[in-house]
Amino acid sequence: MEFYEACGWLVGDEGDGVRQILRMGGLTRFDCALGSHALMRRAFSVALYHALQRQAFGKNLVEQPMMRQLLGQMALRLEGQTAFLFRLARAWDHRDDARESVWARLFTPAAKFAICKAGIPFVAEAMEVLGGIGYCEESELPRLYREMPVNSIWEGSGNIMCLDVMRVLSKQPAAMELLAAECAEVKGQNRHLDRAWRQLQQLLKRPAEEQGERDCPAGLSSWRGGADAAPCFAAAGRSLVPDDARHPRRHTS
């Protein structure tokens, strides 16, 4: 597309375009994480409704042990993500506070990296719950599956998010202090979170050239590995989510 004789207005200082864009980029990255989470919730709703109605071997699917375990794991992932995203939203709402500003700066790219990456296999799992019909357009899930990759790509792909997290940790000492304080507050409550924090500490002690840039956000976003890590989300969002919504912390050790 070409524009002839178009007129524009300079926003910010000349040569400072990237910095101006990045001021907006944090919110749009947060939006990507929220969008992926919403699509995952919709996929889970479709799968759960099907499991409640569909019968196999004399019982509804939801009553079959393996299906109950699968749906429970999917629900844990979603509850953990919800808690984390609420906590991140609070940080964005209170950016005038220095601590909350660092919280938003550090965890926004980590959230985009982890949640957007988790979306594609999550929807694929929901499709399997429905069986063959889950692959057909009538089920709605193929549309959700096609929609998923875009949130991982725009506003910065996975590598960009990883580099951004490393940049924050290396250039803002307050970010590492905040992360240590957050983990100390919930130490001993979940072994998966404790292990992820120990691994991340060891990673950051290595020389910069030995650090895997993608390892750091994966450690920071340790929930990325599966349902047993959902409490890592819940721990981050514990102060905003009421007790009856904190299923991950009660049911996963």
Feature-to-residue mapping (PLM):
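C-terminal amphipathic alpha-helical interaction region
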Residues: 185-253
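Internal glycine-rich alpha/beta core junctions
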Residues: 1-199
